[in-house]
Amino acid sequence: MVSGIQPEASQGLRPGGLPEGIRAAIYAVAFAVALSTWFIEIRAPLWLDETVSMFLIKGGWAGIMSRQVWPDAPAYSCLLWLWTKVMGTGEFMLRISSVLPMLAAVYLLYRAARELFDQDVAVIAAIVFCLHPIIIFAAIDVRPYAFAALVINATILTLVLLRHNHSNWLAALFGFLAASIVEFQLLFAAILPALAVCFIASKIGDRKTLWRQLGIALVVFTLAFLPAIPRLQYMMHTSGTHVFSEAPRLLQLVSTITVRGLVIILVVFVLVAAARRSLDLRNHEGQWTVLLCISLALVPLLILYGLSVGTSIHVFVPRYRLVAVPGIALCWGLVVSWMNSRTLRLLFCAALVVVAACVCFTAASFHRHMYSWKDALAFAEKNASVDNAPVLICSDIPEADHMRMPVGAAIEETGILPPLSYYKLTVPVAPLPRTLNEETIRAGSMFLQQQAERRFLAMAFVESYGTLDWLAKAAGASHTVHELGVFDGVKVLEFVPR
C-alpha cells in the first residue's frame, strides 16, 4: 500500500530530496505504528455490549433468527457465529474477528483516496483513519462496527469508481452496499443522504446515465433493504427504551472532526506550507471531490448530532459516530493535498503518527477498552458457590427498565443479563431492572421475602447503585449488609441473615 510512491509532476508537486525507497519505508513504518495502536487492549475482557453479541449467537443459526427483533445485526451475528465455530470463543480470537475486517476497511479507504489524491496523500488519509480513537476502539470491539466500516468504505470506493463508469453492475453493487451499511447498523443510515447527493452530482452532466444507474441502484437497494425493515420498525416503536446516554455537547462534535485535537498538527503544517509558499489551494481535485469529502464527514455527523440535541433519542455516542470517520479521514487528505511539497507531507505524517502513538500508549483512556463484569462475576462465583447462595443482579441494559422481570429459565432466554452469556455463574440468579422503579421494588421485595433466612449477594454497575442502597435499607431488619468490593465499577454486596 505504501511502496513505490511516485511524484505527481502534473499537479505542480514539488519533488522531495529523499530517495523513493526511504520515503516509502518511512510511510510503511508510520502505517505500522498507526496499526499498533489497535492492539493496546487486544486482550481486554468483554464489556456489556460484546456479551450481548455472544448472547445473540448462543443458540446458533436458529437462535440468531429467533432474536432478530433485538436491535442488532443478524448478518453480523451469523458471521461471528461462523468465526467462533472455526476459531473458538476466546477473548483474543473474538477480537481478531473485528481486526481483520477493519484492516480490509483501511485498504478500501486507501483505494478510494488513491482515486482522488496522490498516493502519499492516500496513505496519509488511511493513517488518519487508523489513528482515529473511534476506529481504535471499533477495531477490536466484538460488535458489528468493524464490518460496518468495511461496507462503508466499500460503498465509498464504488461511488468514486462510478464517477467515470457507465456499468449497470457497478451501480447495482453501489445500491447493495449502501443497503448493507444499514444492515450492520441501523443508525448508519445517516450516511445515505451524503451518498445519494454525491452520486447524483457525479452524473449531473450525463442525465441519461444518471437515471439508468440511479434506477438500478434504487431497485437493488430496496430489495437488499427489505430484511432490515422489521428491525427498523421495532427500533422506531421502542426508541425510548434504548436511550442510555446524555444529550451531546458541541465539544464532542468538534473532537470527532479534529481527532481529539490532533488537528493542531495539521494546522501547524498548513501554516508552514503557506509560509514557504508550498500551499496550493487551487482546486486540482475538482469540486466533486470536495463535495464528497465534506458530505461524507459532516452529513452523517450532523444528522446524529441534530437528532440527539433536538429529541430525547440521544445517539451521539462514539461508536455511532464511526459512520463519519471515513469522510473525516478523506477531509484530512484533502487538506494535506493542498501542500504541494512532498517533504512537508512526509514530515506531517511522521509528526502525526509520533504524537498520536505517544498519546495512545501513555493515556489511561486507551488502556481500558470498556468496563467489564468479568472480575465481579468471577468473585461472585467463588464467594457464592460455597453455600450456593443466590445472586441478585441489576441488569445493565436500558431495555430492562421496560420489562417484567423473568424467572427461572426465562432469565437466560430473554438475555436480560448478557454478561452471563459469556462469564458464567453456577449459582441461582435473579435479575432486577437497571434503575430503581416500580418493577425493581416489586421484584426486589419478592426476592427479599424468599431469601429472608438465607445469605445472598447483590451486584450492580454505577447506574444501579441506587437500587443497592434501597436493597440495603429494605433488608436492614433481616440481614446484615457488607460491601465485598467494587470491580471495574461493579459493586458486590453480601447480605447475611441476622
Regions found by a protein language model. Name each.
Residues 1-19:
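Short, Lys/Arg-rich, polar N-terminal cytosolic tail immediately upstream
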